[in-house]
Amino acid sequence: MENNSFNVLANNNMSSFPLFNSKIEPSIAPALIAVAPIAKYLATALAKWALKQGFAKLKSEIFPGNETATMEKVRLEVQTILNQTLQTDRVATLKAEYEGFIHLGKVFTDYVSQSTFTPATAKTHFLNMSNLLIQRLPQFEIAGYEGVSISLFTQMCTLHLGLLKDGILAGSDWGFTPEDKDSLICQFNRYVNEYNTRMMGLYSIEFGRLLAKNLNEALNFRNMCSLYVFPFSEAWYLLRYEGTKLENTLSLWNFVGEDIGGILHNDWKGALYKLLMGATNQRLANVRFNYSYFSDTQGTIHRENILGAHPTYNGEQTPTGWIGNGRLGRFSAPYSNELEITKVEQEITYNNKGDHSNSIVPANTRNEILTATVPITADPFFKTADINWRYFSQGLYYGWNIKFDDRVILNSRVPGGIPSNRLEYDGYYIRAVSACPRNVPLSYNHNYLTLTYNRLEYDAPTTQNIIVGFSPNNTKSFYARNSHYLSATNDAYVIPALQFATVSDRSFLEDTPDQATDGSIKFTETVLGNEAKYSIRLNTGFNTATRYRLVIRFKATARLAAGIRVRSQNSGNNRLLGGIPVEGNSGWVDYITDSFTFNDLGITTASTNAFFSIDSDGVNASQQWYLSKLILVKDFVNNSGFRNQVPLAPYVIARCPNTFFVSNNTSSGYEQGYNDNYNQNTSSGYEQGYNDNYNQNTSSGYEQGYNDNYNQNTSSGYEQGYNDNYNQNTSSGYEQGYNDNYNQNTSSGV
């Protein structure tokens, strides 16, 4: 895969950072560029963390010149985007919190920068800063203002995790014992999962609220998070390492047409998200808009309807593309547990009721299809869209202008011009186009025994809505060549889960934006094995003797019967890189293979069918697992390359033949994991979590869910312990114990 120029968190000049959708009222406001320097620093730090100075540099990006300018700029801009204005007293409180962080951070960094200092004092300053962040972080999770909160909360979490990494790497010079360092490692790993869960709780509340209001505002909020929130949550995981690459491949969506409200989260998860994604591992080659209009006896046009968009991917006219399942053949047995669609033809079809009594247009309708083909250029990707519609008085007229780049696809058929509504993002191109149903219930046909594929249908035709999906330029190489081309000049490659060559039956698209990718692959029950293959090619001049490791991001909420295996295949040559029978874990886990060379795998620059294959055999009926991404990194040699700086201790990794077993075998007094059966008692305004078996007992009106069997029952503002049997009874400040069966009863401040 080539190193494309756009990377949300790349160390490049500021002009290449995406600012906003440049239509009349930009959906992403330019002031959020304030977040870019933070991202720029993190991208650099992942390659080489500045020992003892990483936190100081990160703090200087969030609070430049020891001022609150960046955080205040982000807050004001997000308030404008979401039309959420914090109360004056809340703003004053947040400003006071910023100033407190600035003060303590300056005290700490100034002290440890001295040529001579007392380790015990340095340790005290470090703990004061860490504890203040833990204590005050709930101030940035504001019930009722989750949309404004999430961007501020994300930056404060980033600051804390950066501080913890500094402590892990430099703690021995700051008075920390080996046991103290283990405790910091434990805290870091716990808080990566905890902060991710809390962040997704804020996102889910706001996104669900906006979906119920209208889809346009929901997608606007989603775009903001895709640019300025989710890449940071991905950075939290990657802060464990040195020599990795942080890359955002999330799409941005623009909605044009009549507002659609009342959308449920299950509608988004089950069908709408998949519809917007189009063929997930394909790119758009041309777009066909099927529209209709009718005339009265005088030939006056009364109404024009966009009935559907027929995108064609990679020039293929036959139904292709994977939206819920990768096979055209029918299942070998009935399977109705998934509220997922398995296969959708490229052409979005709107079916009338059986008796045709609910047709939206009269019999004298003219139907036409207008087609836009790919521009004949050296870079055959649509970059801009000019799409707008006009509603005329008394509900008599609808009109459309649709233009991709310089090609007019649909001219308005109503009197008068329609103003330009240019859609464009710096560093993005158009990969998918969808027509979106308006106030129409989504239905599925679950007769798996009689249909060769499961078709998404609508109960009646619908009109007036188009959604354009923009993908970042760093995905162009794959979509242009359908393979990942590796170059010797790059030290790391990020391969999103959805950029596969093939995928097995009973595999579904899952929306997981916190991974900074367009979804993950969810593998469900099968006796044949679940598999995703990723095609790779080596560019001329590639050094096949260079040693690499493969980092695989996955989540398995139940024990996998035979584990996940990683193989490389070329002309029948298979090599097992590793396998991990994993105990159930509700959070994302990185599996890191042993180092290997492409010579070891039998792959050369002449290879034409080389694959990374991720699979699990014999998954039982109740089991499923998720694949997010692959990261190929150069092994650590001569003080350069990939290495794990924050291990998943106290988990012990014991080597067995061709297999890694992950076990919790330790005499330490703490556990890290944020696993099933987590229970927290509180009454405050939002819940975290996002997945099955979420149990919430609370007086608030929403539920998110993110981890299995998460239970929250609360009457207080927040709690800071995150291990089993943690008990905290306090009316003040913050607590610092993080071990099992920890019990603290205090009314004091610190």
From Swiss-Prot:
Region annotated Disordered, chain positions: 672-750
What superkingdom does the record give? Bacteria
Protein's GO biological process: sporulation resulting in formation of a cellular spore; symbiont-mediated killing of host cell
Kindly list any coiled-coil regions of this protein: none
GO function terms (MF aspect): toxin activity
Checking InterPro entries in the record gives: Pest_crys, Pest_crys_dom_I, Pest_crys_N_sf
Q: Which keywords fit this entry according to its UniProt record? A: Sporulation, Toxin, Virulence
**Gene3D superfamilies from the xrefs?**
Pesticidal crystal protein, N-terminal domain
What is known about what this protein does?
A: Promotes colloidosmotic lysis by binding to the midgut epithelial cells of mosquito larvae such as Aedes aegypti, Anopheles albimanus and Culex quinquefasciatus.
What does the miscellaneous comment read?
Toxic segment of the protein is located in the N-terminus.
Q: Which family does it belong to?
A: Belongs to the delta endotoxin family.
The protein in question is named: Pesticidal crystal protein Cry11Bb
